[in-house]
């Protein structure tokens, strides 16, 4: 049985991937701040409460997780949030907190998991990036900074870990219909062609696991067929 660690497992893309894995017999260790939103009645689901923005606590957290779950051979790095406004409207603390969760936490978690996978001689790491990591847009300065950072990190880690049998795949979706937009002033328009569904991404990740070890998929870019937005209120 494969075993996966998923950060951001309680909602959105992470939740969909967890459900897909569990439905296909893959054990899931889920990292999230609030598991009340997703608590499947599955003996193979292990919820671990963690605030991944507290980056100094992550090394000890990962040490504990891997000690208790040495069978982990899949990691989905998906935790994060969005905040979109002009750069000058962010405080220094907001910038630090944003980059800590959306970039630094991914790097620290991957540092622990890649060492574990190298010792096993195999493993799959999926990093959830964004189309904002491919092209920068206004009011997405911090989000693009984090996602461009993840893209470069994934490329370098792939070259570093590949010879040890560890595959690294970066997934860059466009707008996905998830609770990500709950706190934002905009969201994809209701027409189904304006957003990717989480199940689409979960299927791609699961199907990748079925490919032979010698097949590497460096990066996957996904876009909705159209990109109309609905604004909930007037943007400032």
Regions found by a protein language model. Give the residues of each.
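Conserved glycine-rich cofactor-binding loop
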Residues: 10-11
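Conserved NAD(P)H cofactor-binding loop of Rossmann-fold oxidoreductase domains
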Residues: 78-83
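Substrate-binding pocket helix/loop in short-chain dehydrogenase/reductase
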Residues: 86-87, 94-99
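Active-site helix of classical SDR
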Residues: 110, 146
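Residue(s) in the substrate-gating loop at a strand-loop-helix junction
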Residues: 130
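Active-site-adjacent segment of SDR/Rossmann-fold oxidoreductases
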Residues: 135, 156-166
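C-terminal helical subdomain
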Residues: 164, 170, 188-230
């Amino acid at each position: 049985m494969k075993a996966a660690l998923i950060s951001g497992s309680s909602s959105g893309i992470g939740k969909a991937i967890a459900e897909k894995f569990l439905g296909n017999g893959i054990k899931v260790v889920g990292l999230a701040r609030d598991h009340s939103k997703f608590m499947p009645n599955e003996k193979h689901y292990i919820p671990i409460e963690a605030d991944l923005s507290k980056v100094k606590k992550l090394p000890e957290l990962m040490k504990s997780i891997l000690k208790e779950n040495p069978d982990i051979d899949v990691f989905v790095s998906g935790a994060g949030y969005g905040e979109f406004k002009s750069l000058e409207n962010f405080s220094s603390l907001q910038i630090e907190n944003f980059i800590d969760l959306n970039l630094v936490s991914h790097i620290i978690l991957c540092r622990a998991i890649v060492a574990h996978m190298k010792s096993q001689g195999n493993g799959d790491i999926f990093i959830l990036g964004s189309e904002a990591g491919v092209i920068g847009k206004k009011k997405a300065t911090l989000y693009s900074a984090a996602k461009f950072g993840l893209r470069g990190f994934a490329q370098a880690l792939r070259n570093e870990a590949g010879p040890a049998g560890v595959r690294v795949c970066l997934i860059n979706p466009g707008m996905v219909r998830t609770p990500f937009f709950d706190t934002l002033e905009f969201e994809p328009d209701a027409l189904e062609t304006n957003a990717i569904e989480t199940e689409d991404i979960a299927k791609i990740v699961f199907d990748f696991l079925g490919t032979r070890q010698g097949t590497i998929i460096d990066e996957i870019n996904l876009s909705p067929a159209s990109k109309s937005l609905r604004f909930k209120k007037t943007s400032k």
